[in-house]
């Protein structure tokens, strides 16, 4: 209904937040053109991956028949203030923040061995990029990876969050618990060629901002 409304009301711009879960595991940064629809999606991302791809195709369809400019951002792992910090609903970043900042015994359980690789983008960087893309012409359809372009292992992420918390803590990796053995570095050359401001918040700075926000807004509630 939203896409049809863009068509009916001659909306100038439509931005869809897709993601990178449709990509296969890779040791090298993955570009938009590396995606092969004939490859099976990773089982754990089957539902969300195909849903995102369906909406991407609907954006492509409407881009062919109306004047609306469609922007599809394949976001990496978005993190920061107002993330989901409920352990029943959160992803790896939000869950780790909660586990570290609420920890009482100095032992931090982590699923898997920490070798998974992810790209992370701070939420304010996402909003700034969205605003810039909305303020300029991008053509009928733009599909672009959107992330920091700097991948990190889960073990490195956990260590940085512990450092930012100021707590002394021992990490206990649990290899018998569910973990996703995939690597998801992404190539962000395409979006960087378009953006005037290519800078992104470093992971260390983003974590520190998030820890401060959590302590001011979650721990006090």
What are the roles of these predicted feature ranges?
Residues 1-45:
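Conserved Rossmann-fold NAD(P)-dependent oxidoreductase catalytic core, especially the SDR/UDP-sugar
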Residues 34, 40, 44-56, 86-94, ...:
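Short-chain dehydrogenase/reductase
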Residues 203-221:
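Amphipathic terminal alpha-helices
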């Amino acid at each position: 209904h939203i896409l049809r409304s863009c068509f009916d009301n001659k909306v100038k711009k439509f931005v869809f937040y897709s993601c990178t879960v449709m990509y296969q595991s890779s040791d090298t940064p993955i570009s938009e053109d590396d995606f092969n629809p004939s490859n099976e999606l990773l089982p754990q991302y089957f539902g969300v991956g195909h849903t995102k791809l369906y909406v991407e195709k609907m954006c492509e369809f409407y881009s062919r028949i109306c004047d609306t400019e469609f922007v599809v951002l394949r976001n990496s792992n978005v993190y920061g203030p107002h993330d989901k910090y409920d352990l029943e609903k959160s992803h790896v970043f939000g869950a780790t923040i909660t586990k570290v900042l609420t920890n009482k015994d100095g032992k931090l359980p982590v699923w898997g061995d920490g070798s998974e690789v992810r790209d992370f983008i701070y939420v304010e960087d996402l909003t700034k990029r969205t605003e810039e893309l909305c303020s300029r012409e991008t053509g009928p359809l733009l599909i672009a990876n959107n992330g920091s372009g700097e991948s990190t292992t889960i073990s490195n992420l956990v260590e940085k969050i512990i450092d930012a918390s100021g707590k002394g803590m021992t990490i206990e990796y649990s290899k018998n618990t569910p973990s996703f053995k995939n690597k998801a570095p992404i190539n962000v050359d395409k979006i960087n060629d378009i953006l005037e401001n290519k800078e992104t918040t470093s992971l260390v700075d983003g974590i520190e901002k998030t820890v401060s926000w959590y302590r001011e807004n979650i721990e006090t509630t």
